[in-house]
């Protein structure tokens, strides 16, 4: 199977190389060459388990030995606390797809428990070593660290914005065990970290200094991170059919809290594979660059970066949008390169009227302020005794404003206990207390179970204390890599 760059159709790579490389050498993202020919047969999936469906989806994207692919899928999802992996919960106004039952209580686990196994399959028979570089707005970092911990032939360095993640998210990363893991805070925001990591990927001099080690990514720019996320859209649909909520072939809606555009792009890819989807709704917080883009066709990152109570969505540069635009433009690599060049040079671009019409046909959009987010957390708890985290609450608020036809699924991306300060403030009207005390009080009041991985977090040893300026990240990598040997 071949993948090509969104910015140059002549740059093609075998699937294993695209997976290991993460980002094309021209800065483009890898997309499957014959993706439009790929389809799934939903009828044949009705009696399948989550892991069975994952296998049927992933074999469309990777040419691994099928028995080995099945085996690593089973291993990855055995780490979840429920056999359903991503259970569906019915509320009054929508179904909530719980994506937080993995080892780090965030939706990133769905892909990042599997990605290390996929990389190991791609490395079979090779002495190649991979250095995973990851920028995180909170959840990707811990999920990637946990996934790659002590995995042979890999090392991982995670960068996060020092004041841009919640205390629990930071502690999850700074207490990370594993002889091949490094964590470093940067002075700046997530966009600064992500842009710097992308530039480092393209730094040939730095790559030479690393010798046999090659860079790869655990962010959703890596096709191996993105493709496993397609699975839970299909599984949610199948569950609705099994539960007699819809008939096979009925169209449904998905509302997705979105920052980097990876999660909602996975839904778009599921639709392209044949999933009956009416609308994909992009839900943003006050960093609503995507809302503006989907309504006007103008992408403009030249605005104030706002810190919100949904920090994993505090993003102004949505990397995976490039893959969507490549698809909507009919694989017009030159057009995509021109847009990305405009974004780099001027911080903005405008798509043509044809693409804007397609965007409006495929996607709904909306956004929520912090006050509106808190109100929804309180409202849903009081009315349904269901506890939302702030990111899911953003999506729920946007869902309530949409005039959607058919059943609707809201993607729930994290355990509410990862954001105790915001959730306790909304539900209990308590502020200015230690997050772990708030966790206890929230549990006492709601009786919602606290995930095992979060219970003893405050008693774990701090192992990572590094802090650098964004312009020193490349230098840090060289120093950190010596420590990881």
Predicted regions and their residues:
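PLP-dependent amino-acid enzyme catalytic core
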Residues: 1-485
């Amino acid at each position: 199977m071949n993948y090509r760059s969104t910015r140059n159709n002549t740059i093609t790579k075998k699937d294993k190389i695209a997976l290991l490389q993460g980002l094309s050498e021209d800065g483009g993202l890898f997309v499957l060459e014959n993706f439009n020919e790929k389809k799934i047969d939903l009828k044949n999936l009705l009696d399948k388990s989550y892991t069975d469906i994952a296998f049927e989806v992933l074999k469309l994207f990777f040419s691994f030995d099928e028995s080995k692919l099945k085996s690593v899928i089973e291993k990855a999802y055995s780490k979840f606390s429920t056999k359903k992996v991503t259970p569906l919960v019915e509320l009054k106004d929508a179904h909530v797809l719980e994506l937080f039952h993995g080892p780090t209580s965030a939706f990133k686990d769905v892909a990042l428990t599997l990605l290390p196994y996929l990389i190991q399959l791609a490395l079979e028979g090779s002495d190649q070593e991979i250095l995973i570089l990851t920028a995180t707005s909170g959840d990707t970092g811990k999920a990637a660290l946990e996934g790659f911990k002590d995995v042979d032939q890999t090392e991982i360095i995670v960068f996060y914005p020092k004041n841009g993640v919640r205390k629990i998210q930071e502690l999850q990363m700074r207490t990370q065990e594993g002889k091949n893991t490094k964590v470093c805070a940067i002075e700046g925001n997530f966009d600064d970290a992500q842009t710097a990591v992308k530039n480092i990927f393209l730094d040939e001099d730095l790559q030479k200094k690393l010798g046999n080690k090659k860079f790869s990514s655990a962010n959703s720019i890596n096709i191996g991170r993105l493709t496993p996320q397609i699975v839970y859209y299909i599984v949610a649909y199948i569950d609705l059919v099994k539960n007699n909520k819809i008939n096979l072939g009925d169209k449904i809606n998905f509302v997705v809290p979105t920052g980097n555009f990876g999660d909602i792009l996975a839904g778009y890819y599921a639709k392209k594979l044949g999933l009956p989807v009416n609308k994909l709704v992009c839900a943003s917080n006050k960093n609503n660059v995507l809302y503006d883009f989907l309504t006007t066709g103008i992408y403009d990152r030249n605005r104030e970066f706002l810190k919100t109570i949904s920090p994993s969505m505090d993003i102004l540069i949505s990397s995976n949008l490039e893959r969507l635009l490549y698809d909507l433009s009919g694989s017009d690599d030159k057009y995509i390169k021109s847009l990305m060049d405009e974004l780099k040079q001027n911080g903005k671009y405008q798509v043509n009227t044809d693409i804007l019409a397609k965007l409006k046909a495929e996607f709904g959009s909306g956004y929520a302020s912090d006050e509106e987010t808190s109100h929804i957390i309180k409202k849903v708890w009081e009315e349904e005794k269901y506890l939302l985290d702030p990111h899911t609450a953003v999506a729920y608020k946007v869902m309530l404003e949409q005039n959607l036809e058919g059943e609707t699924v809201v993607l729930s991306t994290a355990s509410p206990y990862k954001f105790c300060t915001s959730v306790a403030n909304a539900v209990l009207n308590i502020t200015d207390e230690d997050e772990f005390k708030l966790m206890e009080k929230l549990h006492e009041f709601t009786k919602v179970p606290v995930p095992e991985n979060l219970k003893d977090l405050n008693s774990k040893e701090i192992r990572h204390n590094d802090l650098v300026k964004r312009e020193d990240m490349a230098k840090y990598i060289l120093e950190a890599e010596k420590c990881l040997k």
